[in-house]
């Protein structure tokens, strides 16, 4: 049977090739210069279990902007869409005291009138890879200036837990040695909210996101009075390496 017309995406990546990545802005300047976003969570979740969550924010613009810069992060991982198009993935892996965020310019994908931001956020839970630090499931989208503040993450965002996903744990005996990567995944496609990144999607059964603390820039916050001198939450630092690429490659006929 011919596989003509079928495309495979090699996911080597963090951000789509040629995507609108902006200059990574130092955290202290970002979080002091704009209305503060809030870390948001799926209500009712413990924040530590395996879970795949969809976040959405519909908003309106009077005109198409020439620039619309935002800063994005999540725990464990996220994939961001604007009007149905993938725009960014991350964050770059690090630890809680140096939690990374990506800076992206959404302007090229925006239009006058209604727009929708959508984020897929997942937490591997107890089966997370050895290199993955985590505080709890969460998502953050921070405006770069007051003009982008309409999309700041907060209770205006909607969220849906995707119950179609389940982890497939991998143990050392099953691979013949030490295993430090994420689990496999099983997906029941009948329970997937197809079309959820687009404007025409109806948010039936979605909930208002629960909101927590605002963002904190690493090394600029007072240290908590605990034996380790650590501040609470995610201490944010700009991405330090270039994003990798995703390249579509077609099967041979």
Locate predicted features.
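Short beta-strands within extracellular/lumenal beta-sheet-rich domains
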Residues: 49-61, 100-106
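Bacterial N-terminal signal peptides
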Residues: 7-17
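Beta-strand-rich ligand-recognition modules
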Residues: 79-136
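An acidic-aromatic loop/edge-strand motif
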Residues: 24-45, 120-253
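Extracellular beta-rich ligand/substrate-recognition surface
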Residues: 43-53, 91-99
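Signal peptide processing junction and immediate N-terminal pro/mature segment
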Residues: 18-24
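Positively charged n-region of N-terminal signal peptides that target proteins for export
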Residues: 1-5
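Aromatic-lined ligand-binding clefts that engage carbohydrates, nucleic acids, or primary amines
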Residues: 59-62, 66-81, 117-119, 206
């Amino acid at each position: 049977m011919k596989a003509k017309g079928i495309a495979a995406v090699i996911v080597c990546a963090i951000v789509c090739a040629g995507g609108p990545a902006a200059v990574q802005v130092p955290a202290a300047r970002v979080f002091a210069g704009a209305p503060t976003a809030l870390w948001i969570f799926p209500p009712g979740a413990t924040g530590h279990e395996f879970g795949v969550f969809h976040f959405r924010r519909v908003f309106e613009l009077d005109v198409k902007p020439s620039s619309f810069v935002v800063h994005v992060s999540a725990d464990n991982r996220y994939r961001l869409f604007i009007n149905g198009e993938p725009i960014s993935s991350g964050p770059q892996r690090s630890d809680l005291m140096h939690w990374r965020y990506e800076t992206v310019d959404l302007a090229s994908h925006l239009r006058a009138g209604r727009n929708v931001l959508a984020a897929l956020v997942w937490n591997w839970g107890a089966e997370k890879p050895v290199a993955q630090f985590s505080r709890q499931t969460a998502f953050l989208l921070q405006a770069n200036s007051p003009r982008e503040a309409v999309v700041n993450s907060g209770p205006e965002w909607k969220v849906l837990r995707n119950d179609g996903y389940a982890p497939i744990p991998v143990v050392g005996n099953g691979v013949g040695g030490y295993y430090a990567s994420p689990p496999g995944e099983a997906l029941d496609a009948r329970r997937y909210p197809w079309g959820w990144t687009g404007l025409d999607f109806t948010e039936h059964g979605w909930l208002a996101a629960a909101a927590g603390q605002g963002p904190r820039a690493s090394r600029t916050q007072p240290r908590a009075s605990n034996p380790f001198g650590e501040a609470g939450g995610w201490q944010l630092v700009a991405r330090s390496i270039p994003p990798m690429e995703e390249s579509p490659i077609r099967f041979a006929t």
